[in-house]
Amino acid sequence: MNRQLTLYHMPSCPYCLKVRRYMEAHDMEIPLRDITADPAARDQLQRVGGKVQVPCLFIDGTPLYESDDIITYLSTHVAS
């Protein structure tokens, strides 16, 4: 089952970098939204998740926070 995934991040965030490095190491292409460069992305993160916290993986529009939880999700549901 294919899910719609989007990673909300900030380039300077070490936890975001951890998730992006995991994605790169496993050849995962997930759309990224930089909340520092894209005010609309920041607004959506606040509106849907109720807070501005990154990294945040939206899974079919539902937010998942915390880098370790995101990596666990990716390794279980996305990695081949």
Where are these regions (language model features)?
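GST-like domain detector, emphasizing the conserved glutathione-binding G-site
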Residues: 2-10, 17-80
